[in-house]
Amino acid sequence: MDIVFLVARILFVLIFISSGLAHFAQRKAMQEYAAAVGAPAPGLGVPLSGLMILVGGLMVLLGIWGDLGALLLFLFVLPVALIMHAFWKQEDPQMRQTEQVMFLKNVSLAGGALAFFWLFVEYGDELPLTITGPLF
């Protein structure tokens, strides 16, 4: 059953690793979108958040201080949900629905990241297929 924990980590972090890479590959477009929705300091925020989710995703995936990695992901997705996907501000019904789905996706990812954080903290040294134990 050890493989189940590894597969769960792979599936969970795919979105963070691919999005983290996109923060750099599509930096200008992401900065423009962040500015359009009113995110603070998109010129700094996009690359920093890209680094945050790329590193956090790799930490969870590899099991290198997975608790810290999961915490980084958690600290990313909640503000992003509130700032980037504020569906309650949308007047167009289709845009409101799209942003609500994205908001709820991020809230769900926050729950998953929090669960991984707890798992790494509580059982870190006993977890299979990890490189290090927890940092916290």
Where are each of the predicted segments found?
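Interfacial loop at the N-terminal end of multi-pass membrane proteins
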Residues: 33-39
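Extended, low-polarity transmembrane helix blocks
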Residues: 1-29, 40-55, 61-136
